[in-house]
Amino acid sequence: MKNLSKFTIASLILFLFLAPCAQASKPVRIATIGASPLINKNQSPEALVEQMISFWQGQINQVINSKLDLIVLPEICDVPVGLSTSEQKIYVEARKDKLSDFFAKIARENNCYIAFGSLHNTDKGLRNSLILLDRAGKIAGTYHKNFPTIPEMEQGVIPGDQSPIFQCDFGTIGMAICFDLNYDELRAKYAQQQPDIILFSSVYHGGLMQSTWAYSCRSYFVSAIGVVQLPSEVLNPLGEIVASSTNYFNYTLATINLDYELAHLDYNWDKLKKLKAKYRDAVSIHDPGKVGSIMITSEDKAISALQMAKEFDIELLDTYFDRSRMFRKKRLEKAL
């Protein structure tokens, strides 16, 4: 501390003073688009690339005027549907970074993040990846599909083995692709890390597995499904659908607030009543029913959900579960 300048010390004190407030009320505007680029493949690879750019420009035009923070697109959305393995290889070589550059331009011009699924060559081989672009159009993170299907791997796709968490200016993001959703070992990694949002790009929906992932990871869950007949959705950390595409519109928009905490009703009933009585519209206490868990969300720009919970000594969900585990362990030891 002796070697720090007065300016550095003052800055540190200011940061520590403001930090608790920095997390309060964090609305994020999201769009997810479910679409499959069906185009005339009887053309040169270069012409196919131009068709793909035109297709996605039209799709993104549906949502781009909504002042978005994040756009999520489906799995391998930079490759046309219906190509054979050999045709895919020729197309990917001709495409190079043209689709990525196109999405980067959209991100840059509209000051938003974009996550898109890509089949692309890397120094380790062919990858099925979800690529996150930041507001400047630069790559903020890349997730490689951990569990490709057997046919994918037979066609050359190399599995990933990491579950990275990416930091955005609005919060943290984890990712999964299609078949990944079936694997508890991947979900368990994210459940430990608890990102604010999990992005799921896919050509399969996953059904109840989406809710399982959202609740067990304590995360918002945003899916972009590359089959227009299947809904692309936004789920809250309790596993409930809060926004969905429909049979009429292949996209959906949602504003989600990342300043939330989960708690259990046990031991918290009266505390929750007092919390609501004090903060009124500045706090949302949402009960999905049937599970005993609730979500506390701060609508106040100065006070976070965590600060509210601490003020009324509200025990959070995972803390309560851990306390129950320890109590059980002691009872078992006493019984032996």
Identify the residue ranges that each predicted region occupies:
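Bacterial N-terminal signal peptides that target proteins for export
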Residues: 1-10
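Bacterial N-terminal signal peptides
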Residues: 9-19
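Acidic/histidine-rich helix-loop elements
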Residues: 36-52, 154
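CN hydrolase (nitrilase-like) catalytic-core segments centered on the catalytic cysteine
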Residues: 95-113, 181-288
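Active-site catalytic loop in hydrolytic enzyme cores
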Residues: 121-193, 202, 208, 216
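A short C-terminal boundary segment appended to hydrolase-like catalytic domains
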Residues: 259-336
